[in-house]
């Protein structure tokens, strides 16, 4: 958490067009599993890890303000905590990072499919020979180092590389989000499903082409996924689960404008108990595993897991792992201070 709070502070400073602080509300009801004292202790810890700065402080929302909380159910409501966290459009942030890298000299091959990589036989001199397909044409290129950052496809990509590196056992966890009609004026709400007490967030959402937040983003679910990541899609049961949670706290039956699903990569726990309930995924540590083909002179690194907030810190760790294999060059920029602009 400390790392994510540090990286959040950098993003707020370097990418104000893309990342902004939002008030988060945690309502606590008589039947809530997490009691007020426990949440308060957690928020104190959160504030201390963030240096007790203005952006990590929290408060109890006075009873007289409850009526302003976007129609939040007040029956049985005991207290409401408010704290701050950052919100971004993940696709826009990713495009901004890509554009920044390109401006600094990176070559991007989008809409391409990795086919295979062979070599290098001599770790000191040879290069990887890479084959890829772009616009129905096969191409080749060479590389001193391969970083496999293929997310849920990481082990599929690794299997196409001529290497002795072993794959890391992972679980793929599907998360579905719904885009709902409506507006949330006050901020983001941390809700707990009445069915299994899993966290679900309801937040203001800006649709593509619109100047301000005009919808609600609701999510997410956690469903074990097997199969081809390319065909992941929202399940009817997931949509029902999310709508049920929203109605429990806001009464109205929302109109679903859109739904989408993605996959998280979780390294397998030591206890591979197949009967564990799905809501235990929420409690699992979302660690990032960096697997190399050798310790001393790595030429291949695969990334498993990770969080968007810490993408820059993860990249620094990747470079540290690969430093013995990289040429001795002066950096062209410092990502701790490099501005990120919203892509046009």
In which residue ranges do the predicted regions lie?
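Dinucleotide-binding Rossmann-like beta1-alpha1 core, especially the glycine-rich loop
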Residues: 1-68, 199
């Amino acid at each position: 958490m400390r790392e994510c709070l540090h990286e959040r502070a950098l993003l707020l400073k370097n990418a104000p067009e893309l990342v902004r602080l939002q008030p988060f509300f945690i309502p606590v009801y008589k039947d809530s599993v997490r009691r007020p004292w426990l949440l308060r202790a957690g928020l104190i810890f959160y504030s201390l890890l963030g240096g007790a700065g203005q952006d990590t402080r929290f408060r109890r929302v006075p009873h007289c303000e409850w009526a302003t909380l976007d129609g939040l159910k007040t029956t049985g409501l005991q207290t409401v905590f408010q704290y701050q966290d950052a919100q971004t459009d993940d696709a826009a942030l990713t495009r901004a990072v890509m554009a920044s890298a390109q401006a600094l000299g990176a070559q991007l091959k989008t809409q391409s499919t990795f086919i295979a990589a062979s070599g290098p036989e001599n770790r000191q001199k040879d290069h990887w020979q890479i084959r890829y397909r772009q616009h129905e044409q096969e191409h080749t290129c060479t590389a001193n180092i391969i970083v496999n950052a293929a997310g849920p496809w990481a082990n599929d990509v690794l299997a196409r590389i001529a290497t002795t590196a072993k794959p890391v056992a992972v679980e793929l966890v599907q998360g579905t989000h719904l885009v709902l009609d409506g507006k949330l004026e006050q901020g983001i709400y941390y809700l707990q499903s009445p069915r299994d007490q899993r966290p679900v967030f309801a937040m203001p959402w800006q649709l593509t082409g619109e100047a301000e937040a005009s919808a609600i983003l609701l999510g997410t679910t956690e469903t074990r996924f097997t199969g081809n990541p390319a065909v992941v899609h929202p399940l009817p049961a997931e949509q029902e689960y999310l709508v049920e949670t929203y109605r429990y706290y806001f009464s109205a039956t929302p109109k679903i404008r859109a739904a989408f699903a993605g996959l998280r990569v979780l390294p397998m726990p030591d206890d591979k108990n197949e009967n564990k309930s799905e809501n235990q995924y929420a409690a699992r540590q979302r660690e990032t595993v960096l697997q190399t083909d050798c310790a001393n002179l790595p030429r291949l690194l695969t990334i498993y897991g990770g969080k968007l907030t810490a993408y820059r810190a993860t990249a620094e760790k990747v470079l540290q792992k690969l430093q013995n294999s990289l040429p001795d060059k002066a950096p062209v920029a410092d990502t701790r201070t490099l501005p990120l602009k919203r892509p046009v």
